[in-house]
């Protein structure tokens, strides 16, 4: 596994022993001394005159080893032959200078010192161990207070703090020897040493059994955990206080002479020097028997200097160097982006690499890249030298060097030989997904720029405006093989994020392909008939027919049996030309290209060719259509001038119409019919509709077919329209700004400015409009910079949480599965069932409901054909395997994961699916963040206020609850009513959720056609509607306390608005509500359940009625305003994704009913309302919720709610979904929410990537009841550990622990991974390492990150295979060894009765010690 070091003849190194895990624990003073090669007594470093290290100083050669190889300091012994001799004059061992990198020293401290990590890294381990607060500890350590260690017979208590006076008084009162108290780290050390861990643990367990209340058990559990960790790991508590400080090897803290007699030195030397100085001074003071107070001060300073050495700035002032810069301590060396982990272990500089600017290389093949000769010569130097030597052109490396420097002709020939078939890797930063590094075969070119194939640009996200790329050379044969097989650009046609081709033409190529497939009326040669593509080419060359003429041609095709046939097609010469490039295949017929090809269609063509004709064919095809696209675009000469931007004639009419509308809204507002917020919303809506209308007029005009009046030929479409329509460049949104109207702008805060920009760029903006537009433009640019960073950080967290998710086995054999159904958003299907199950494994047989035949068998991978069958049948949902439910112990299994999207086949064992998932989710984040500003902050989207039918069918209601008001409108009164459109067979075609207060325009059983209005709602306010008729009575709606009257300055109208009554002094116990009374009796009207009809009011509700007014059922009692329209773009999107993956509880989150039952309102508590649910099932306990007063509660007393219903609106907290509705519901919620954000941007990501991340978030279980196990209540443990402990408990007949799965955010989950190395390299390094060392954690080196850090092959891909072979070999060896041992024992037993003395050393067994295999 570890690459064995090559043995140097001068320095035969023993091969590195392979290891399986790394354990970290506390170092005892004896351990530190055993590492050390000597004590450092002096603070001197080197003699500034002779530059030789001072003896016993920080660079002492006697302790750390010689400065020059095989030479002692005084020069008495030189050369190899004295190896291992210790010079009697200077005491230096004659050996390699390299040992100065590995030999450590130590400093004997004159007084113990607390280790700052265990003191200050929260929670303080020393504090927990002693059950003292951090403040008290610091008082003792920094010599402010004494602490009682042994109270004796006095009435003092153990651990009591005393000031100096109190201490002296106590000594007077009780006598000197009656009790022991001490101060400083010595006191702490004594207390820690006195702890007997086993009795302490027993005592704590006993306490825990008796403890009651909330806080006490928590505290005990914390201590118990720590004590048990110490017991298990074999650490002693007193080792957290240092008596010996280790000194790291001098070469790791070098001192470099600069010119001019100055020195550059590592900060550590300064920090060590301070420690040594203070330590020596303290020793001297103790010898001199100095007064206590001086010694104490010196001890405090020693403590501070050791603190600074370990973690500068953690406590007290930061210690600065000569130039006022804080010194870098040992902790700083590890932490952060510049620390050891991220700078040197996870990211390294690479030998044999170069970088240069990229230019386009359209004449390259897909697997090639152009490499400048200069670069190639430099990169392949060693290969050239060896080849020169082999050919006998040079006898030494020096000669070869000269030849290469002179660039002799034979060198170039050799370079060509060397480079042939030797792939190189190209990388463009930022490498956001694995396609950011691909392998190509180099082609030598003149010049200094790297040439890149145009088709791979979209994978690298590269353009040629000055981008740079790096070249890396794979050296070993294995590396070249992997580069060719796995990383070659031709092997990465499909994107791992969604399985669609990523090698797609873009921009000019698309424009060319669009142009060549155009079809126009009345061109020369229309109606001609051709017998073969060759004839068409002749006619084109002769000019008798135009590229776009409508003709008939005969094209060679292949039928399903594989025979060649000729078929006639109505087509154009251009399409025939394109069709000639298609590989002959029944599944790729000419119809594929016999249409107008836009970007989407081209992608589909490539996809089809790849799926059915194989990789080789499709790569050749891609290269050919690239060449064709470029050539045709160049020949078409499409370009545009300013007159190609058409401004519709109707623009000003539309604008005038909307202006009148807006005036009317202003007037309504003045008359007080609508509120300020409503006016704003209506105005914004009107303008955004106007803007869309102008844009669509413009698009209609620009896309209209035009005919030449003289020749009656159809003219070419408008150039701008062709570019946008084909998907080459530009978009309708940009065309709208150039030729329509610029539209509404958003302020930096995200609100929309009411006045739109009516001009477009062609007309030019007025000064005021220009000023308004600067808002959005600036926001766009600022956002871009910020979001790039945020998105990168999101990707980093995702990679960290998912890095150890690898496909480890073929099938875990689980019966669990999740249900897949089509994704519906706002009633339209955004992802069909077929799309969602494609590439998954069915968990049970899928049966066609019509015919009853099995479409997909259980355990079968669903490919495109099967997915199409599922689509055609009327199946609504099916069960499929998912990474979420996979039961593999480590990683996931291939069956649960399904298809490897980038290859189109079942995923291979060893694929790092976690990292691919993280990249697939993170990469578009950055893409999108870089793209917001192209629209320049234009406000998008007015509010939708009605829903039209998307297809024909019959109406059906679910959970119907309708009320008809006086004007005959049907109003929804229920919370979870759905409207369905069903087709003739009764299969559901669309479904809509109807919110409370929606007006429904259709009745059950109605037939509807496309575009019929189904229902409408008020998008800006949430109404409260009377369910019975009667007279209004106000309760607790006191003017000035719970109601404020707002007079609008503009209109003079007043409105009654419910204000926040809790803030008022007298309002604490009010319950503002509106009652409906019977006009005859004055009694409150009762509803069907028999409860009085009351409407509790929430803050900011606007009352629509007066006290004492008559009201009829269906009228509005009050309106609650919703937030205004905010603009939607991924700025809202990226934080939303991060929020979902971090599993944060949203502010004002929804409250979800945990059980089925009836709603009851309990007694109010301070400013919360108490809602309880009485279960319909008698055996269960009622559940209570507290809701802040003044929040609108959609349920009423006596309503029946089902488990999972919302009792309070808002975004649900994912933890609640998991707890109440289970893992599958949580997965559905997270997948849909994340997908919604990406869909808004038109980014496709496969669901399984999100599932893999969610799986990683669900690894831990929280213990609810510890049973009779060692697990503690409230502890988070791994699912595996939880199950193992319980199995053991059950086997021994004890009560198992109870637990439930919990959801951890990705940051939390990364910090709680099994591997402490991985967690430490992610964030909070000191905290992670402190915890790991007290627990004596073992890192099993399972994930990728920890293996990269310790410098091994990663256990994925080819590295995983080697690891498996090693494991098998070990198991075999083990068997052989056991067999031999058994045989030897038998032989020994036969040979001699005294087996002991025969087998003293284990015979020949002793030399075959295998490292423990890891099961």
Curated annotation (Swiss-Prot):
Protein family per UniProt: Belongs to the RNA polymerase beta' chain family.
Name of the protein: DNA-directed RNA polymerase subunit beta'
UniProt-annotated binding residues for Zn(2+) 2: 812, 886, 893, 896
Enzyme class: transferase
Chain residues that bind Zn(2+) 1: 72, 74, 87, 90
Binding positions (Mg(2+)): 463, 465, 467
Organism: Dinoroseobacter shibae (strain DSM 16493 / NCIMB 14021 / DFL 12)
Gene (UniProt): rpoC
Any single GO CC term annotated in Swiss-Prot or TrEMBL for this entry: DNA-directed RNA polymerase complex
Subunit structure: The RNAP catalytic core consists of 2 alpha, 1 beta, 1 beta' and 1 omega subunit. When a sigma factor is associated with the core the holoenzyme is formed, which can initiate transcription.
InterPro entries (UniProt xref): DNA-dir_RpoC_beta_prime (IPR045867), DNA-dir_RpoC_beta_prime_bact (IPR012754), RNA_pol_asu (IPR000722), RNA_pol_N (IPR006592), RNA_pol_Rpb1_1 (IPR007080), RNA_pol_Rpb1_3 (IPR007066), RNA_pol_Rpb1_3_sf (IPR042102), RNA_pol_Rpb1_4 (IPR007083)
NCBIfam families linked: rpoC_TIGR
Required cofactor(s): Mg(2+); Zn(2+)
Pfam families: RNA_pol_Rpb1_1, RNA_pol_Rpb1_2, RNA_pol_Rpb1_3, RNA_pol_Rpb1_4, RNA_pol_Rpb1_5
Gene3D superfamilies found in the cross-reference section: 1.10.132.30, 1.10.150.390, 1.10.1790.20, 1.10.40.90, 2.40.40.20, 2.40.50.100, RNA polymerase II, clamp domain, RNA polymerase Rpb1, domain 3
EC numbers: 2.7.7.6
